[in-house]
C-alpha cells in the first residue's frame, strides 16, 4: 500500500502535468508563432522572420514591452542579439513581426534559437507570454549551384 507521501507526490505530479497540458493548449488558442525558415548562402546577408499572430478574440498588446532574444548556432552572425518593439517591421492589433538579419559564415543546417516575450490581451484580461522557438536555416556554400 502506497504511503501518504507517495500518494501526495503522485497527485501533485498529475496536477502539474494537467496544468502544463492546459497551458500549452491554451497558448495555441491565444496566438500562433509563424517562423520564417530560410535558405542562405555563406557570406550573404539574409533575413528570416518571426510573426506573433493573435487568435480567438485576443490581440497583441501594443503598449507592453516586447522582445526577441537571439542565440544563433556557431557559423551564424546576427546583427543584433536582442530585438525590441522598436525593431518590429510590422505591427497591428492582430500581429507583430520581427525580421532577423544574419550572415552565415559556414555551410550546413543551422538554427537561431529565440525567446519571444510579449503580452496578449482580451477586453478584460492580459496574459504575459515567454515562448522559445527555433528558426531553421539551410546554408549553402558561396558559389554552389542552386537546387531547384
Outline where the language-model segments fall.
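N-terminal secretory signal peptides that target proteins for export/translocation
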Residues: 1-5
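Bacterial N-terminal signal peptides
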Residues: 10-21
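Extracellular/lumen-exposed scaffold segments
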Residues: 26-148
Amino acid at each position: 500500500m502506497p504511503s501518504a507521501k507517495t500518494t501526495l507526490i503522485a497527485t501533485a505530479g498529475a496536477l502539474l502535468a494537467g496544468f502544463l497540458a492546459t497551458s500549452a493548449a491554451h497558448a495555441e488558442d491565444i496566438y500562433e508563432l509563424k517562423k520564417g525558415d530560410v535558405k542562405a548562402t555563406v557570406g550573404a546577408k539574409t533575413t528570416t522572420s518571426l510573426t506573433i499572430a493573435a487568435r480567438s478574440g485576443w490581440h497583441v498588446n501594443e503598449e507592453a514591452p516586447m522582445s526577441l532574444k537571439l542565440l544563433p548556432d556557431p557559423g551564424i552572425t546576427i546583427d543584433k542579439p536582442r530585438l525590441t518593439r522598436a525593431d518590429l517591421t510590422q505591427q497591428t492589433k492582430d500581429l507583430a513581426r520581427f525580421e532577423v538579419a544574419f550572415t552565415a559564415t559556414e555551410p550546413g543546417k543551422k538554427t537561431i534559437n529565440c525567446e519571444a516575450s510579449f503580452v496578449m490581451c482580451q477586453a478584460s484580461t492580459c496574459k504575459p507570454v515567454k515562448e522559445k522557438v527555433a528558426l531553421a536555416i539551410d546554408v549553402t556554400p558561396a558559389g554552389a549551384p542552386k537546387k531547384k
